[in-house]
């Protein structure tokens, strides 16, 4: 199991495939995606890597997090997330993951926070049909109707679809196809829509329901400079 990545949603556009057909894509950008911490079985009881992406102002970073990033020898990050990995896919602290971590045609699972819609009625929130427009109906055209039972059980069951706050929830879309990547600019183009607004932070992982392509880099696609720095550090430790 490989690590996922953190990316920022830039928006949507379209590209053309070899057949001349246009493909709607969402553009995700990886900016300075570094490993800032490790989790090991010996110390933590499980194996994972903590990634940081983007740049944050030092004055807006807490003292504890400044020390955390300094220990990893990376600049303060705007977003941090942890990913479970198998022991053979554990990455060294300070390593930088590039957009080539994913390959064209690969399926990924994308997680983000959906756009908030505010307080919404049942017709918008749950696709209720509503009541009759006329013929004896008044006031209740867009109402949800009865919500309860009888004297027994004498309550409204939890989870009943009603009006309320819509959106602003954590949403995962599975099996989205990676159309292409651009390592130099740190771009990942995925087919279709991705939950979240422009500028939102998105979690991208290998699809859990589809096998990983054989040409996908393992344990990850690392920046050459970062990989070289790791090798030098390893030689120095020896």
UniProtKB/Swiss-Prot annotation:
Modification type N5-methylglutamine: residues: 151
One of the GO biological process terms: translation
Gene name linked to the record: rplC
Species, as recorded: Brucella anthropi (strain ATCC 49188 / DSM 6882 / CCUG 24695 / JCM 21032 / LMG 3331 / NBRC 15819 / NCTC 12168 / Alc 37)
GO molecular function: rRNA binding; structural constituent of ribosome
NCBIfam families assigned to the protein according to its UniProt record, in alphabetical order: L3_bact
Entry-linked SUPFAM superfamilies: Translation proteins
Keywords: Methylation, Ribonucleoprotein, Ribosomal protein, RNA-binding, rRNA-binding
Protein name (record): Large ribosomal subunit protein uL3
Disulfide bridge map: none
Gene3D superfamilies assigned to the protein according to its UniProt record, in alphabetical order: 3.30.160.810, Translation factors
PTM: Methylated by PrmB.
GO CC list: cytosolic large ribosomal subunit
Top-level lineage group: Bacteria
Sequence intervals crossing the membrane: none
Function field: One of the primary rRNA binding proteins, it binds directly near the 3'-end of the 23S rRNA, where it nucleates assembly of the 50S subunit.
Origin organism lineage: Bacteria, Pseudomonadati, Pseudomonadota, Alphaproteobacteria, Hyphomicrobiales
InterPro entries (alphabetical): Ribosomal_uL3 (IPR000597), Ribosomal_uL3_bac/org-type (IPR019927), Ribosomal_uL3_CS (IPR019926), Transl_B-barrel_sf (IPR009000)
Quaternary structure (record): Part of the 50S ribosomal subunit. Forms a cluster with proteins L14 and L19.
Similarity field: Belongs to the universal ribosomal protein uL3 family.
């Amino acid at each position: 199991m490989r690590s996922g990545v953190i990316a920022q949603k830039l928006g949507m556009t379209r590209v053309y495939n070899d057949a001349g057909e246009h493909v709607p894509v969402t553009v995700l950008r990886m900016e300075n995606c570094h490993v800032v911490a490790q989790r090991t079985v010996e110390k933590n009881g499980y194996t994972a890597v903590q990634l940081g992406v983007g740049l944050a102002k030092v004055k807006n970073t807490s003292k504890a997090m400044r020390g955390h990033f300094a220990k990893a020898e990376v600049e303060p990050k705007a977003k941090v997330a942890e990913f479970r990995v198998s022991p053979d896919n554990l990455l060294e602290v300070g390593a930088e993951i590039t957009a080539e971590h994913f390959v064209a045609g690969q399926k990924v699972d994308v997680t983000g926070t959906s756009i908030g819609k505010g307080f919404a009625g049942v017709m918008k929130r749950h696709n209720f049909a509503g009541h009759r427009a006329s013929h004896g109906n008044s006031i209740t055209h867009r109402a949800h109707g009865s919500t309860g039972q009888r004297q027994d059980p004498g309550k409204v069951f939890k989870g009943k679809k009603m009006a309320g706050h819509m959106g602003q929830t954590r949403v995962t879309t599975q099996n989205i196809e990676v159309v292409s990547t651009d390592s130099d600019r740190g771009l990942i183009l995925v087919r279709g829509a991705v939950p979240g607004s422009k500028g939102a932070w998105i979690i991208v992982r290998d699809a859990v329901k589809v096998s990983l392509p054989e040409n996908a880099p393992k344990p990850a696609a690392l920046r050459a400079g970062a990989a070289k720095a790791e090798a030098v550090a390893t030689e120095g430790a020896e």
